[in-house]
Amino acid sequence: MSSTAPRAEIDEGLHNGALGVSFGQRIPGLIVNGRELQAPVFNEHEVRAAAGITMVVGAVAFSFAYFQHQYIPLQAVASFFLLEFLIRVTFGIRYSPVGMAARLLMRNQAPQWVSAKPKRFAWTIGLGIALAMTIITNSGIRGWTPRSMCLVCLTMMWLESALGLCLGCKLYGWLARRGWIAKDDAVEVCADGSCEVPWAKEVQ
């Protein structure tokens, strides 16, 4: 991938995001594959690191439920994930607790910028699953229903953190290619072709 933006312009983009001007970071002068991006972006490395963190937290809670039949950790994690994804969908990953930790971990790594819109779509799915898990676990439902949903979440988190495969972004691209989602100029560049829409560029 080729992406360039003067340091001052990147800082300006982050500052604009902090003021809530846009979802994601607007970075004037950001060039990816010879093309200047206009729409908000996220750092793919931070997104993948955040997926890894949530996977570890979720795996610990799942272990308590599976091996010791203790569901309080799973109940607490489901509620935390509900808040986490609500913040991501509303304000972006830089303001969520896990997103802040991921940004700290990736602070010394060169960013890989990707369009924010498909990620928001994927996190909306995560928000729905977290809401369902919160309702299920707080309703006293135990057994394979919450554990199966947790396994689905862990699988999706592992795919994104380890392989860079965003299933929610894949679904976004699938819907867009069939015309069920209208062309959106905010989708300009995708990590490893994860959203694969005709008007988007692929970033390696």
Predicted features and spans:
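Membrane-interfacial helix-loop segments of redox and metal-homeostasis proteins
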Residues: 2-204
